[in-house]
Amino acid sequence: MAGHQSSVRERKKLATRERIRVAAAELFTRHGYGAATMRQIARRAHVGLGTLFNYAEDKRDLVFLIFNEELNATTDVALAAPRPGQPLAEQLLAVFAVHYRWLAEQPALARILLQELTFYSSGKQAATFHGIRQRLIDGIESLVRKAKVKEDPALVARYVFFVYSASLRWWIASPRPDPRHGIAELRRLLRLLVAGLR
């Protein structure tokens, strides 16, 4: 009986979490990150403000509540995308192209995510986000290590991640971000980067 009550309680928590995610995504998309309030989000999700704060400390934390689950799944797909035998630049591009296509599906929310993740170090969702980001960087480092570059693979992986992050922000800032254009530009940048490692 206790196990049944526990599973019912767990399902209720997951349902509440999902209502909060959906409400925050809708209000951020419709009104913008700055205009949407925690109170509006709680009302839309049919939860009390205290319940909302159990899931996210502030609006920034809510952005990551919206994205962390999808970002984790997208990162799984991205890290499996490179094919053995591809040049390093193409392997890296295979990883990042998955993220471009995913973010292109929801550019308004993607802009908020990319704006808010700078210096995101505290909050209920922060550790999850940092874990996902580290998995991505570790995956990049693994590709760099296999390519046997002269420089320290960890340093090169960080450099690659910085190029990707800046390129992604540049692309998503356009009025209608087309993933094909963003990926094509990133390909050129990655080829330049890899050529500099020889």
Locations of the language-model features?
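Short secondary-structure transition hinges
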Residues: R101-D138, I172-A173
